[in-house]
Amino acid sequence: MNQYLFTSESVSEGHPDKIADQISDTILDAILTQDKKARVACETYIKTGMVLVGGEVNSYAKIDIEELIRNTIKDIGYINSNMGFDANSCAILNNISKQSKDIEKGLNQLDPYMQGAGDQGIIFGYATNETETFMPAPITYANKLMIRQSEVRKKNILPWLRPDAKSQITFIYENKKIVGIDTVIISSQHSEEINLSDLREGIMEEIIQPILPKKWISNKTKYFINPTGRFVIGGPMGDCGLTGRKIIVDTYGGMARHGGGSFSGKDPSKVDRSAAYALRYVAKNIVASGLADRCEIQISYAIGVSNPISIFIETFGTQKISNKKLINLIHENFDLRPHGLIVMLDLLKPIYRETAVYGHFSKIHFPWEKIDKANILRDSSGIKI
């Protein structure tokens, strides 16, 4: 018997780093709404009473950055200085400049399919058949707990909840299959008046119990709810926030490797983002086809060069055909050039604000979550599954 524990964490939409991600992607969406060919790299820094946005943009779009930022913060729920941050009164500093002409020349080509990558980099994609969404269970349920935290807060079911929160969940695996949940952790910001006992009871009854499958819960499952006690000071007052600091929460919860590039605030010419979406699409279709139970793909690019430099695949011994044949199928069925990624997944639409919370993967309405190539891959493999 090979038993082990695996843990993933998530954070709420009101976590400072996630506020920053949402602001960056809100600005990106506003620009893409007016100018689909825009080049955008928008970073956000947030701290008590202040938001600073910076980066590089090449676009003719005219947007009201201050209004976008204030509305985003209001949507998240920071509307009162008692929460440590107020959308209506925070200072906003804008230091966005033009993109370098040298980079622009390297990307823009007469034939868009010859468009080079916006930077060098390594990118990973992953899928597993351990859940219906082809995502690892630990990050899936860590995200679900945070989605539920937001829901009960905004519906006033637990009126003392505040926007900042974190979750962490540890699964028990036996022979690579889930057999239970070992530990659940939730820390949630709250108002002054709630006592710790009522807080823990409310979070258990309204957030944890409705989300976690009973088949994985036992009398040995451990729960830590606000384990340090009071959590009144949170959000940007408790910690500064920065775009791109939650890359493991954004992806696979540590179950797969990560190339290091973040997503939010970047237009799809940046392969850090577009190739990560594409490789999720490729890996998910391989697993959905039955050609592997788990699939991790690495790709690399050079700045200004259209074709990928390398492709590597790892199937953890679960493949039904050789990894070499799988790579051939990838080349035959997916265009992984930067412009090819954009066309394949229709990435010029203003869809990115929603990706900035609760993970970029598993939301089935996004194009990189389609499994429309699964049957093609299975038929092309030459084997019956």
Swiss-Prot record:
Cofactors: Mg(2+); K(+)
Protein residues bound to L-methionine: E56, Q99, D239, K270
GO terms for cellular component: cytoplasm
Catalytic activity: L-methionine + ATP + H2O = S-adenosyl-L-methionine + phosphate + diphosphate
Residues where K(+) binds: E43
PROSITE patterns from the UniProt entry: ADOMET_SYNTHASE_1, ADOMET_SYNTHASE_2
Residues holding Mg(2+): D17
Intracellular or extracellular location(s): Cytoplasm
Keyword Phosphoprotein attached: no
Chain residue ranges for the region called Flexible loop: 99-109
Pathway field: Amino-acid biosynthesis; S-adenosyl-L-methionine biosynthesis; S-adenosyl-L-methionine from L-methionine: step 1/1
Note on how the cofactor is bound: Binds 2 divalent ions per subunit. Binds 1 potassium ion per subunit.
Short name of one Pfam family: S-AdoMet_synt_N
EC number(s) recorded for this UniProt protein: 2.5.1.6
Keywords: ATP-binding, Cytoplasm, Magnesium, Metal-binding, Nucleotide-binding, One-carbon metabolism, Potassium, Transferase
Catalytic class of the enzyme: transferase
GO molecular function: ATP binding; magnesium ion binding; methionine adenosyltransferase activity
InterPro entries recorded: ADOMET_SYNTHASE_CS (IPR022631), S-AdoMet_synt_C (IPR022630), S-AdoMet_synt_central (IPR022629), S-AdoMet_synt_N (IPR022628), S-AdoMet_synthetase (IPR002133), S-AdoMet_synthetase_sfam (IPR022636)
Binding site for ATP: H15, D164, A165, K166, R230, F231, D239, R245, K246, S262, K266
Function: Catalyzes the formation of S-adenosylmethionine (AdoMet) from methionine and ATP. The overall synthetic reaction is composed of two sequential steps, AdoMet formation and the subsequent tripolyphosphate hydrolysis which occurs prior to release of AdoMet from the enzyme.
Assembly, per entry: Homotetramer; dimer of dimers.
Name of the molecule in the record: S-adenosylmethionine synthase
Organism: Wigglesworthia glossinidia brevipalpis
